[in-house]
Amino acid sequence: MTHSTRILLGVNIDHVATLRQARGTRYPDPVKAALDAEEAGADGITVHLREDRRHIQERDVLLLKDVLQTRMNFEMGVTEDMLAFAERIRPAHICLVPETRQELTTEGGLDVAGQEARIKAAVERLAKIGCEVSLFIDADERQIAASKRVGAPAIELHTGRYADAQTPTEVAEELQRVADGVAFGLAQGLVVNAGHGLHYHNVEAVAAIKGINELNIGHALVAHALFVGFKAAVAEMKALIVAAAR
């Protein structure tokens, strides 16, 4: 995984599938959303196949792998079932994430430092089939250093604490935490991505952090698309982050 010379936008389409699964219909189609996102300037498409299959389904992943013109960033938990599925479909990019059944969304970063042997085995297993692996972690030096030790070429820093911060002081502290994590990750030789909870009113400060390779954004795009359409929502976000990163 190489570091891009410009900031990239990864569009997460999970919540298009959430809307579909709410009624068990065939619409809206997350695959169509992915193709529209690509046309609007998305640099990649992110999907999370959860253990409980609450949104994205196996069929979505298989279709996306066949039709995407950019690339698929496949998010998955570190389970035997998901590792076996990944070995079957061989996505080029995989992001390992923590997962619990009761959570509304991914609530924190993967504890790499607390389970190095398990994560290292998964990274090595996926690397053998040609997958470039990133780890979704908190912006914490201990976790970043552990990610380097287990052999992951990339990390995605969890920006949820920044997104949830309420006061100006808290926002500044959490933004600095992300910036410090980016700098430490780069010093370790890692490609550094970021995401979670980012939207049109808070993304620019993160995009302006030097060294971030890609921002992965989903819920805010799907929500804004209700009013402006999906292509317009993606194009607007892409313009925001590119301008902020200059």
UniProtKB/Swiss-Prot annotation:
Its main location: cytoplasm. Keywords: Cytoplasm, Pyridoxine biosynthesis, Transferase. NCBIfam families: pdxJ (TIGR00559), PRK05265.1-1 (NF003623), PRK05265.1-3 (NF003625), PRK05265.1-5 (NF003627). Catalyzes the complicated ring closure reaction between the two acyclic compounds 1-deoxy-D-xylulose-5-phosphate (DXP) and 3-amino-2-oxopropyl phosphate (1-amino-acetone-3-phosphate or AAP) to form pyridoxine 5'-phosphate (PNP) and inorganic phosphate. It comes from the Bacteria. It is found in: Cytoplasm. The active site is at residues 48, 75, 196. One of its GO terms (cellular component) is cytosol. PANTHER family: PYRIDOXINE 5'-PHOSPHATE SYNTHASE (PTHR30456:SF0). It holds the Pfam family PdxJ. 3-amino-2-oxopropyl phosphate binds at residues 12, 23, 197, 218-219. The record marks 156 as: Transition state stabilizer. It catalyses: 3-amino-2-oxopropyl phosphate + 1-deoxy-D-xylulose 5-phosphate = pyridoxine 5'-phosphate + phosphate + 2 H2O + H(+). GO terms for molecular function: pyridoxine 5'-phosphate synthase activity. The gene is pdxJ. HAMAP family: PdxJ. The lineage of its organism: Bacteria, Pseudomonadati, Pseudomonadota, Gammaproteobacteria, Pseudomonadales. InterPro entries: Aldolase_TIM (IPR013785), PyrdxlP_synth_PdxJ (IPR004569), Pyridoxine-5'_phos_synth (IPR036130). It is an enzyme of class 2 (transferase). This is Pyridoxine 5'-phosphate synthase. Pathway: Cofactor biosynthesis; pyridoxine 5'-phosphate biosynthesis; pyridoxine 5'-phosphate from D-erythrose 4-phosphate: step 5/5.
